[in-house]
Curated annotation (Swiss-Prot):
It catalyses: (2S,6S)-2,6-diaminopimelate = meso-2,6-diaminopimelate. It comes from Mannheimia succiniciproducens (strain KCTC 0769BP / MBEL55E). Homodimer. The record marks H159, E208 as: Could be important to modulate the pK values of the two catalytic cysteine residues. This is Diaminopimelate epimerase. Substrate binds at N11, Q44, N64, G74, N75, N157, N190, E208, R209, G218, S219. The keyword Chaperone does not apply. Keywords: Amino-acid biosynthesis, Cytoplasm, Isomerase, Lysine biosynthesis. Belongs to the diaminopimelate epimerase family. The record marks Y268 as: Important for dimerization. One of its GO terms (biological process) is lysine biosynthetic process via diaminopimelate.
Length: 274
């Protein structure tokens, strides 16, 4: 199997072309490949498939290191666009892809950065999914070690984001897994810890569902910015500083799609026997 190793701000991926090669990945194979000591090592595996819809260019599948399939990965989307361009699978600047729960437009800009139309944030609790009687700007979540206030949203995958005074000292290691597996999130959740620097600038750490804390989480950056804008803490354009680097998020509010802009890096190509 031929593959490429890529990263978006340190959030690392193995990307596989399933357009020109036949591949099949049972959960156990994904876990073995994800092992950083005995396999290749990655946060997520991205599969480029032929489009299911003739009006689209590709189908985009994402698997976590634990073998679970997820519907969205923002950093992965940028790497997906870089990969299909580098490999000559398309020469389009605007690339239309489907995911397991929607469609996305990936734009390769003239400056090399990649802008992703992430669609509209979804606030309705049942669609996140999140157990709540009605939408609220903040929800109270109780854990064994701490009770927190957080916003909840879906960016194609479930996110909760809480505001902290200092991301460096935030209790991500303990609180992250407790919130990820909280009973009110039936499909688990990605957990963001957000420090507001000013209305156009935040710092963020993300404990990802099925992957733990990563260097960067694109959909997590989108979720944090959307929640901050919705809560009146942030303006429409936000720089998000993650441990691995920065992303730029733009959202004009309800009824508008949210855009994420950032880099995507090709590290190396390889071949591995399955």
């Amino acid at each position: 199997m031929q593959f490429s190793k890529m990263h978006g701000l340190g959030n690392d991926f193995v990307v596989v072309d399933a357009v020109t090669q036949n591949v099949y990945f049972p959960e156990e194979v994904i876990k073995k490949l994800a092992d950083r000591h005995r396999g290749i090592g990655f946060d997520q595996m991205l599969i480029v498939e032929p489009p299911y819809d003739p009006e689209l260019d590709f189908h985009y599948r994402i698997f976590n290191a634990d073998g679970s399939e997820v519907a969205q990965c923002g950093n992965g989307a940028r790497c997906f666009a870089r990969f299909v361009t580098l490999k000559g699978l398309t020469d389009k600047k605007d690339i239309a892809v489907s995911t397991t729960n929607g469609k996305m437009i990936l734009t390769v800009q003239d400056d090399g950065m990649i802008r992703v139309n992430m669609g509209e944030p979804v606030w309705e609790p049942a669609k996140i999914p999140f157990i709540a009687n009605k939408f609220e700007k903040n929800y109270i979540l109780r854990t064994d070690i701490q009770t927190v206030l957080c916003g909840a949203v879906s960016m194609g995958n479930p996110h909760c984001t809480l505001v902290v005074d200092d991301v460096e000292t935030a209790n991500v290691t303990e609180l992250g897994p407790l919130l990820e597996n909280h009973e009110r999130f039936p499909e688990r959740v990605n957990v963001g810890f957000m420090q507001v620097i000013n209305p156009n600038h935040i710092k963020l750490r993300v404990y990802e569902r099925g992957a733990g804390e990563t260097q960067a989480c694109g959909s997590g950056a989108c979720a944090a910015a959307a929640i901050g804008i919705m809560q009146g803490l942030l303006e429409n354009k936000v720089q998000v500083d993650l441990p691995g680097g920065s992303l730029w998020i733009e959202w004009q509010g309800e009824g508008h799609p949210l855009y994420m802009t950032g880099d995507a890096t090709h590290v190396y190509d390889g071949v591995i026997k399955l």
